[in-house]
Amino acid sequence: MPEQQRLASLDSSTASRLPAYSQTLFEAKTEKGLTFEAIAQHLGRSEVAVAGLFYGQVQASAEDVDKLSELLSVPKEAIAKQMMGFPDRGRAGPMPPVEPLIYRLYEIVQNYGYAFKAVMNEKFGDGIMSAICFNTTVDKEVDETGASWVVITLKGKWLPFARF
């Protein structure tokens, strides 16, 4: 029997920290029964970028707003101004995170951050991985035992530190 599709929705404890349009988008997404993957296909963007739009962490283009308005049956005027403004990133949750899945990602950086840094430095030199010239994907793999595995790919441009 196929697994029933479940949709990500906006938790009331998070809503107050997000832009006003977030609730509008999440309600319309739920009403239409759409996944971030389906919305991403319509917008021609990655599903993580689209989820970022919903949480106010990614700036929308005029084309994004038009397509979201059409797909979700949300009046363009209700979302355009805020979505096309400059995002106020990094305010969606407390630090350190308390949501268990988000905390596990934080824990990965705590535990392996210096290891990632050391390996990147050896491969690329002194610098940083951009989170601006960046993309990411989330995929699902199922192993031979039937266990599900999460595959998160982080791809950022390497930015060497300038000598001055």
From Swiss-Prot:
Task: Report keywords, A-Z.
Answer: Lyase
List the transmembrane segments: none
Q: Name one GO biological process term.
A: cyanate metabolic process
Enzyme nomenclature, EC number: 4.2.1.104
Q: What class of enzyme is it?
A: lyase
Q: Which InterPro entries match?
A: Cyanase (IPR008076), Cyanate_lyase_C (IPR003712), Cyanate_lyase_C_sf (IPR036581), Lambda_DNA-bd_dom_sf (IPR010982)
Q: Which reaction does it catalyse?
A: cyanate + hydrogencarbonate + 3 H(+) = NH4(+) + 2 CO2
The record's listing under Pfam families reads:
Cyanate_lyase (PF02560)
Q: Where is the active site?
A: R104, E107, S130
An example Gene Ontology molecular-function term: cyanate hydratase activity
Query: NCBIfam families attached here?
Result: cynS
HAMAP family to which the protein is assigned, alphabetical? Cyanate_hydrat
* Reported function: Catalyzes the reaction of cyanate with bicarbonate to produce ammonia and carbon dioxide.
By sequence similarity, the record places it as follows:
Belongs to the cyanase family.
Which protein, by its recorded name, is this? Cyanate hydratase
Q: Which organism is it from?
A: Neurospora crassa (strain ATCC 24698 / 74-OR23-1A / CBS 708.71 / DSM 1257 / FGSC 987)
Give the classification, highest ranks: Eukaryota, Fungi, Dikarya, Ascomycota, Pezizomycotina
